[in-house]
Amino acid sequence: MKRTAARELAIQLSFAAAASGAEPAELLERFFDREHYETLAAEQELCAEYPDDNSLEYIRKLTGLIAENRSEIDGFIERYARGWKLERISHTALAVMRCAICEILYMDDIPAAVAINEAVELDKNYDDPDTVAFVNGVLDGFMRGEFPSEEKE
């Protein structure tokens, strides 16, 4: 499974965890049950291939870090989404931004530019162009505000 697909699954699972209040580990266990996953494969192309061990580890790590650091990550989103409360932001846009900010802050093997570009591209699958532009602006503002001396690698 390519990293982009694993990232999209992580975004979907983070969205589901936030919406349901479920623990990410429990959600992951149910979601990646082979029998359950095979039924998903028939319904959505993203699930056509069962994740390999590296992809599963990446998804587990990312969803766990998002859940563990959600209040800090949400604080950054509120700071750079000037004039917007989290409640007004689409849930998918929130999940996408949480993923990108988490990767930038806590996953050193992922360049910031990759995290932002992937987030924006994935958000295009779920949100309208105005929301995608908003997500891009928040993530760009986050980089400029928190890492002013660094390039987006």
Question: Where are the regions a protein language model picked out?
Answer:
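N-terminal interaction/assembly modules
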Residues: 1-153
